[in-house]
């Protein structure tokens, strides 16, 4: 059966280009009815180019159809908003008539648009959940460390510990300058940072520009004789050399219970020193930083210390939890960072990291880390791994038990969880928001397996849990939470439809057939495909109709095709309660709810769309055909329908 497709809507100045392509082309006149649009879009089994007048349709209606807006201009006028285009085509590409360049531009942008979908779900989760499972750097970037608990199983970065493997080299990309990267991966939950050896504050100001939110939530005590005055109210400059803990203690208020971080990046000038003197000085500076941090371990949650590898020692000792390479460092910079887990108050539970202790270091092993991981052309993924490893609490969400509201985004169907489907459904049942991959097209960028859409629908819907495809979830949040998910959101609806999303939300009252619930693009085509490939699948429905009875073809084809994810509980309530009303009452409920639809049959406006027995007959027939293969309980739905 076909997978979800996108409608690649181009404005008129690009319509000549798409005529040279090989995808279908859909010309819109502006005179189409709701049903015309629904039926025509349902005939396409691949992405399709479209152009013409769409000004009478709202953004939610067009997103419901899978529209992506492409133009050389900034905006497109729709019925309810002026929409910022999703893909802005450079004018030189438009003038060149180069179809490959045009389609590459669309493809590259669509990959970036996936982030908009994930960010929108996370924004909802940040309002509703405390615990986040399966987390990566994207969650850390926007989480509130004083409120949210971030769990996951991130990749472990290269680390030096006694008797442990360093790790193997991996592909990487360039990143920020070394010291900016250092602040980027180490600053997360700390509210007070004591930064010794801050230099001229350029690093701190670059970090402020890169991550203004994280910069603002920290009180910075910076220590360096050359540090200039700073106008930022959360930066306190101390123009001193730090020789002992006394130099820092006098600037700390122990009446405040805050998480503190200690950063030591001290390096004196070489001046006239010979090699031996210079190495001895550097070694002493690094050890002094460790000793001060360790002595003040009750005041700081952790420390990050400069760690220069001596040339003249085969082995030496330091106080450390981990040594690790530096993202953005030059390939010939034989200097690491030393992370020390200390005993001070922390918002993040870092008990899985060992306490800092005296560690023996073998010089050739740590030099190997430099050779494997340093270089100006490297560092981006190393920095991400360090950020995740230091600040994400390592727990498997499938096994975690807690009463806190939780979010489970983009990890449940990782291939490592194959065979654990019952646990996945249990998590979706108790999660505030969860996602699972249901797409059947080949996956090139992710290592996920697909859950069957029909099983997800039958397993995932409860009185207090909505189960929708990803596009339906975004449309639902646009409707119910317009302050969280804005109408102008840029995302790829076809990509989103590859996910099932569960939301701990009640059924809307009244249970209207909003776009988020009812789209079923291509349902008529799916029905025809079933008939021309295997007519026995329709025999029972045909026989019932000949007898003057009915079976909900809508429900039956939805389940048999495996092409849709929508919320059964809400849909049944919509059929039995809302559709049983007359035309006037139906329209009144739609208006009162500010709901929108993309299918409306005027001939059915005064009648129920189905009756209870139609739904029961469809489920029974589905059970008869697929019951042995269906992993979900159909009997429980039959029982529910009898009493709903």
Curated annotation (Swiss-Prot):
It is found in: Virion. Keywords: Capsid protein, Outer capsid protein, Virion. Gene3D superfamilies: Orbivirus VP4 core protein, C-terminal domain, Vaccinia Virus protein VP39. One of its GO terms (cellular component) is viral outer capsid. It comes from the Viruses. InterPro entries: Orbi_VP4 (IPR007753), Orbi_VP4_C (IPR043026), SAM-dependent_MTases_sf (IPR029063). Belongs to the orbivirus VP4 family. The VP4 protein is one of the five proteins (with VP1, VP3, VP6 and VP7) which form the inner capsid of the virus. This is Core protein VP4. It comes from Bluetongue virus 10 (isolate USA). The lineage of its organism: Viruses, Riboviria, Orthornavirae, Duplornaviricota, Resentoviricetes.
């Amino acid at each position: 059966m076909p997978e979800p497709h996108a409608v690649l809507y181009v404005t008129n100045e690009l319509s000549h280009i798409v005529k040279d392509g090989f995808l279908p082309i859909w010309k819109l006149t502006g005179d189409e009815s709701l049903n015309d649009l629904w039926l025509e879009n349902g005939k396409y089994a691949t992405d399709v180019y479209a152009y013409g007048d769409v000004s009478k349709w709202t953004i939610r209606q067009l997103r419901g159809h899978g529209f992506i807006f492409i133009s050389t201009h900034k905006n497109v006028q729709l019925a309810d908003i002026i929409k910022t285009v999703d893909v802005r085509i450079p004018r030189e590409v438009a003038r060149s008539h180069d179809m490959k360049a045009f389609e590459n531009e669309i493809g590259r942008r669509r990959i970036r648009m996936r982030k908009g979908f994930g960010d929108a779900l996370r924004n909802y989760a940040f309002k509703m959940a405390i615990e986040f499972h399966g987390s990566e750097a994207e969650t850390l970037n926007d989480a509130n460390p004083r409120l949210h608990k971030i769990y996951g199983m991130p990749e472990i970065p290269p680390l030096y510990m006694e008797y442990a493997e360093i790790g193997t080299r991996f592909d990487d990309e360039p990143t920020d300058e070394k010291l900016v990267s250092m602040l980027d991966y180490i600053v997360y939950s700390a509210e007070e940072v004591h930064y010794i050896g801050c230099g001229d504050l350029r690093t701190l100001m670059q970090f402020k520009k890169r991550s203004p939110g994280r910069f603002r939530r920290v009180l910075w005590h910076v220590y360096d004789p050359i540090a200039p005055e700073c106008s930022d109210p959360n930066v306190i400059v101390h123009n001193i050399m730090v020789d002992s803990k006394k130099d820092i203690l006098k600037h700390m208020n122990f009446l405040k219970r805050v998480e503190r971080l200690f950063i030591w990046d001290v390096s004196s000038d070489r001046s006239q020193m010979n090699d031996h003197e210079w190495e001895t000085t550097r070694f002493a500076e690094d050890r002094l930083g460790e000793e001060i941090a360790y002595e003040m371990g009750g005041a700081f949650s952790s420390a990050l210390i400069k760690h220069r590898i001596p040339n003249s020692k085969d082995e030496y000792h330091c106080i450390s939890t981990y040594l690790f390479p530096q993202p953005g460092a030059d390939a010939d910079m034989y200097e690491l960072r030393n992370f020390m887990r200390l005993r001070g108050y922390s918002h993040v539970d870092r008990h899985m990291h060992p306490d800092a202790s005296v560690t023996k270091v073998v010089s050739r092993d740590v030099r190997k880390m430099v050779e494997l991981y340093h270089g100006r052309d490297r560092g981006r993924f190393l920095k991400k791994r360090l950020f995740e490893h230091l600040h994400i609490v390592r727990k498997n969400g499938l096994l975690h038990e807690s009463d806190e509201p939780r979010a489970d985004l983009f990890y449940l169907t990782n291939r490592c969880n194959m065979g654990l489907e019952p646990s996945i459904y249990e998590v979706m049942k108790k999660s505030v928001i969860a996602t699972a991959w249901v797409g059947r097209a080949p996956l090139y960028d992710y290592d996920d397996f697909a859950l069957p859409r029909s099983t997800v629908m039958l397993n995932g819907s409860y009185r207090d849990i909505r189960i929708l495809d990803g596009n339906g979830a975004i449309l639902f949040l646009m409707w119910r939470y317009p302050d969280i998910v804005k109408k102008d959101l840029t995302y790829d609806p076809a990509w989103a439809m590859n996910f099932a999303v569960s939301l701990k939300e009640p059924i809307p009252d009244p249970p209207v057939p909003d776009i988020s619930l009812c789209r079923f693009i291509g349902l008529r085509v799916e029905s025809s495909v079933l008939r021309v490939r295997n007519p026995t699948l329709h025999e029972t429905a045909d026989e019932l109709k000949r007898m003057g009875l009915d079976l909900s073809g809508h429900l039956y084809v939805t389940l048999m095709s495996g092409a849709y994810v929508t919320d059964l509980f809400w849909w049944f309530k919509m059929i039995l309660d809302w559709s049983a009303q007359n035309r006037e009452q139906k329209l009144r409920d739609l208006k009162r709810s500010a709901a929108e639809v993309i299918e409306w049959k005027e001939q059915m406006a005064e009648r129920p769309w189905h009756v209870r027995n139609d739904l029961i007959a469809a489920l029974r027939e589905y059970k008869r055909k697929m019951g042995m293969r269906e992993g979900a309980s159909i009997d429980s739905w039959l029982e529910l329908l009898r009493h709903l």
